[in-house]
Amino acid sequence: MSMTSQIMKITKLEITILIDIVAIAAFLAVPGSTNHIYDLLILIFAGTLASMSASIFNNIYDMDIDPKMKRTSSRSQILNANTRSLFFIIATAMVLLSFVTSFILLNPVTSAFILGGFASYVLLYTIILKRRTSLNIVIGGIAGSFPALAGWASITGSVSATSLFIAFLVFMWTPTHFWNLSVNNVDDYKKSNIPMLPAVVGIKRTEFWIMVNTSILVIYSILPLFIKEIHVGLLYMPMAAVMDALLIYYVARPMINNYNKKDFKKAFHFSNMYMLMLLIGIMLILVKF
């Protein structure tokens, strides 16, 4: 396997893509954003590097538990005692290049937000929270909020009601998304002594908290109806209404079907579509009527 293939394998490409889409949505929500396409390319470059770097550091720290879990066991074939130092150097170079590029070619505020996302994932979530508390993904989910702040700031050098709305939309969504996934890996988490919610409180109690979190998320998603300072365009609200209804349906299915793990997996996959469609709804602010 080539070095490029190995890097792709351990950098959690799906997370990087989501982070880039969040940043792009916030970027395009800025009035006049289409006049700053060069800045968008720099933002994507810097954000991608930081996200990939964070994933590598996460994998380095979790080298002791990844082989015990089916979902992550293949990473140990790439990242081991012989290759750890090399990947540490690569990850360090990535995050430094990300910071310097965004600082010089965009602005210090954007670079600070990118670095904040990196630090919250590596330090706050991976090192401090993941192995200590079942609230790991709730608090650590703040890492997913920083791309929205960086996206807006890459043009304006500031924050706004819109960028904060997008940032906390991702934050509210993360527990619903990840808890549905973790139900399917509950045995691995128990084996690895990782206190993910299903491993601590059981599947039925986890479904209860998924429903609670989803209810909060759905209510939060319609906030632009009541706060005029949040600018997300005319198409966002009808898309949010449809996706909210579908999300409630999918996350309620496990409870209706006797907590079938397949339903949790379907809810996990739909939660990806949910967030993608809401972000696309925000991007469609560019469509003028």
From Swiss-Prot:
Superkingdom is Archaea
Disulfide bridge map: none
Q: Where in the cell is it found?
A: Cell membrane
Q: Which EC number(s) does UniProt give?
A: 2.5.1.141
Which keywords, in A-to-Z order, does the entry hold?
Cell membrane, Heme biosynthesis, Membrane, Transferase, Transmembrane, Transmembrane helix
Positions of transmembrane segments = 13-33, 37-57, 86-106, 109-129, 137-157, 159-179, 207-227, 232-252, 267-287
Quickly give the catalysed reaction.
heme b + (2E,6E)-farnesyl diphosphate + H2O = Fe(II)-heme o + diphosphate
The molecular function terms of the Gene Ontology recorded here are:
protoheme IX farnesyltransferase activity
Q: One Pfam annotation, family name? A: UbiA
- Renumbered to this chain, the signal peptide range is none
CC per GO annotation:
plasma membrane
Its record classes its membrane topology as:
Multi-pass membrane protein
Q: Name one GO biological process term.
A: heme O biosynthetic process
Q: In which pathway does it act?
A: Porphyrin-containing compound metabolism; heme O biosynthesis; heme O from protoheme: step 1/1
Q: Fill in the misc note.
A: Carbon 2 of the heme B porphyrin ring is defined according to the Fischer nomenclature.
Q: Which family does it belong to?
A: Belongs to the UbiA prenyltransferase family. Protoheme IX farnesyltransferase subfamily.
> What does the record give as the function of this protein?
Converts heme B (protoheme IX) to heme O by substitution of the vinyl group on carbon 2 of heme B porphyrin ring with a hydroxyethyl farnesyl side group.
Protein name per Swiss-Prot or TrEMBL: Protoheme IX farnesyltransferase 2
Q: Which organism is it from?
A: Picrophilus torridus (strain ATCC 700027 / DSM 9790 / JCM 10055 / NBRC 100828 / KAW 2/3)
